[in-house]
Regions:
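Acidic, PIN/NYN-like endoribonuclease modules and their adjacent C-terminal/linker elements
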Residues: 46, 106-166
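Active-site-proximal, substrate-binding regions of enzyme catalytic domains
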Residues: 2-97, 103, 110-114, 153-166
Length: 166
């Protein structure tokens, strides 16, 4: 199983939906930069915080800081701190997949040639391998209760790809 580097939105979303364990089933280790950890756990009661703490205590989620490099400084000028650290760490560990939802972060990852997926990608994979019976209820929960943003076109495409009715 591969190791992944996660940005905050994936941990928050999957944690809030009670699906953070999907990451444990797919990846040997989830690496989280300090700025991402702070974002996920800062409020203490933020959706996904308790689940992230549990994953860290179980040892499959680990904190890992990127090196302080000119690249990190450059990324911090255009992205939030968590995304910048996640992308910088991904350049240090090119065998790792990046978990990332933010459009600006994904665009930068594309430009840098980094492999990534996001919350929706994890849910679709879980459905495909039988670890999640349906994507729609989880996606609806994220959109309705946890401010997960997904446009109508993408929402419909995801459900089609999952073989689920609108």
């Amino acid at each position: 199983m591969p190791t992944v580097i996660s940005d905050a939105s994936v941990l928050i979303g999957l944690g809030a939906a009670g699906q953070i364990e999907l990451l444990r089933g797919f990846y040997a280790q989830v690496l989280v930069p300090p700025a991402v950890w702070a974002e996920v756990t800062s409020a203490g009661t933020r959706p996904g915080a308790a689940e992230a703490h549990a994953a860290k205590n179980q040892g499959w989620l680990q904190l890992r800081a990127p090196a302080a490099t000119p690249l990190l400084a450059h990324l911090r000028r255009t992205l939030d701190a968590g995304e910048a650290e996640a992308l910088a760490l991904a350049t240090e560990l090119p065998e790792c997949l990046l978990l990332l939802d933010d459009a600006d972060g994904r665009e930068t990852a594309l430009q840098m040639g980094l492999d990534f997926t996001g919350t929706v990608g994890v849910l679709l994979r879980a459905k495909r391998v039988g670890r999640l019976p349906a994507v729609k209820p989880v996606l609806d929960q994220l959109v309705q209760h946890h401010r997960f943003r997904v446009g109508r076109t993408l929402y419909e495409a995801v459900l089609r790809q999952a073989g689920e009715a609108l």
